[in-house]
């Protein structure tokens, strides 16, 4: 009987490992890459190819400048309905709106009274929700002019509104994650919170980026803004307050080369584009400490023009961030 039991246990383990959605066992024992992880990575790679975005090298330098969010030049391989970059970003928002109705209408446009005609006396900047504009525009306007204005306003909204979480939500939608598996939101912190709380049935587990090996399909996240969450401990301490006001960003891991000690990630709204980033790993296969702003304070030196003639100017590093959370795909 004991031998039979041991065989059954072994068989169960093999079946779990062979499952297309094989779960990561823990932060310390990530396990193999799942089919869902590979699917998410491929979706991100396909999206990058269509958008033709930026690329950042392992030193944090922008070495390829691609299309940006409000680009009006046709995408090389764009789908007929999304032939421009800005229309593609609008697609991300539309997809998010199907999971969180009202998201689109609440996006805001920034403007200032009199700014075009008399900038010297222009009023302070104001915000208007997209819903208000659409409701109040003239109903009897010429169809052509109405379309021109509507498209211009949508492009302005896209420029004014961070869309990186909408990009991640779009990928999750394409991969078929349910509302129980992923908290669709326009803010990364909202979908990070259930992972930190250990919500049952959630697709991701929250781990310390400094202690966990990333896998394809995982998300790596950092805090940003004036008072960012700088470490995993900060995220844990603030878990009950994580909402749309908490500024953060997440990339999805799309490739890993442990021999070369590097990984590739993809993120939306990174320098206003869908951006491919290369990051370095340490000898344990974890994110290199060279990328951790909590250990290496960000430089705040002269601007780029001054750097041309100032040898003391510190180079910008787009990879130096307050990386704290690794969202491990279960």
Language-model segments: residues:
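Low-complexity, Gly/Ser/Thr/Pro-rich intrinsically disordered linker/tail segments
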Residues: 272-330
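Sec/Tat signal peptide C-region and signal peptidase I cleavage site
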Residues: 20-24
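...with weaker cross-activation on analogous glycine-rich loops/strands in unrelated enzymes
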Residues: 184-271
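Secondary-structure boundary elements
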Residues: 19, 174-179, 255-262
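Bacterial N-terminal signal peptides that target proteins for export
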Residues: 1-10
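Short, solvent-exposed loop/turn and secondary-structure capping segments
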Residues: 56-59, 181-184, 232-234, 276-279
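N-terminal capping segments
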Residues: 25-180, 321-330
